[in-house]
Amino acid sequence: MAPWGIILIAAAAAVFLFVIAPALLIFIAVFYHKKAIPFEQYDLKKYQNHYYIPFLSRIAAAREWIQSKPHTRVWQNSYDGLRLLGDYYDRGAARTAILFHGIGAEMYTNVSAHARFLYQCGFNVLITCQRAHGESGGRWTTIGLREQHDVLSWTRRAEELGAEEILLYGVSMGAASVAYASDKLRGTRVKAAVIDSGFYSIYEQMRRDAHKNHIPKIMLPAQQVLARLFLRVNLKQPTAGTLARAAVPVFFLHGTGDETVECRWGKTNFEACASPKELLLVEGAPHTLSILHNPELAGKRLQGFFGKYFT
């Protein structure tokens, strides 16, 4: 074999070993079906530095409280044929809150406190399990991009269950799911939305995570290419783009102590939103935990917001 042929083979092997293979592994780790951390394992040594740890007892209490209420397991078909799981807490109200959790989260862990609060505010509560998580169908998550259509599917299901007024409440990836759906809500019974700890775009979030975890920058464009090829989504699509056409009032909630999604993205999304809007930055609150970090402040502001748009 000619020397140039050997060089080409060696170069191709190097590209595969040091770029393509690692990029594929990262892609699978980020987007493939999530086996959520069981709530009981958060107290193990492995998670001793997790930001949930100081809040575990309060999360457990909220989880136990909401799960003690009568509820029905429901299923909803997605636009692309997946079966999505939900738990419906019917308190006989005319208004229903639909909750959407974050990536990698077990169905209840990062929305239990929110569900309890909303139930106490007089809402029926529908807790959803996102696609490619837990018992819901799907092999791949798209961190909000396809999930936005699931938001619409669950909205229709809530209407079928008798909801006259609907609140959408998303945390983290769930917040992005709601944000991406925010311009598609005309003609529905959705009266308002809450975007809690929402990011700006998947690509920007991955850029931050890559820097924090010392992952080479070349992996980012590789993820964009792989997402385009295999998932048919654009990781650079900003939530601010759809919020600029938002069809319902939006309450933005973010903690200044959020080390997962920068607080500035909450401000950016708020500024981009075209519909009536409110912003609450909770001093020192970690990711998705504003409602537990300062329940008096967050609760008061949210109840005031609900009072404007729900009967």
Model-derived regions: residue spans:
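Conserved alpha/beta-hydrolase
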Residues: 117-137
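The serine-hydrolase catalytic nucleophile loop
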Residues: 103-117, 130
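N-terminal membrane-anchoring alpha-helices
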Residues: 1-57
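Catalytic nucleophile-loop/oxyanion-hole region of alpha/beta-hydrolase
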Residues: 133-165
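Hydrolase active-site cap/lid region
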Residues: 180-233, 243
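Catalytic histidine-centered segment of alpha/beta-hydrolase-like enzymes
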Residues: 285-296
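Short beta-strand/loop motif that positions the catalytic acidic residue
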Residues: 245-247, 252-254, 258
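N-terminal cap/lid segment of alpha/beta-hydrolase-fold proteins
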Residues: 53-92
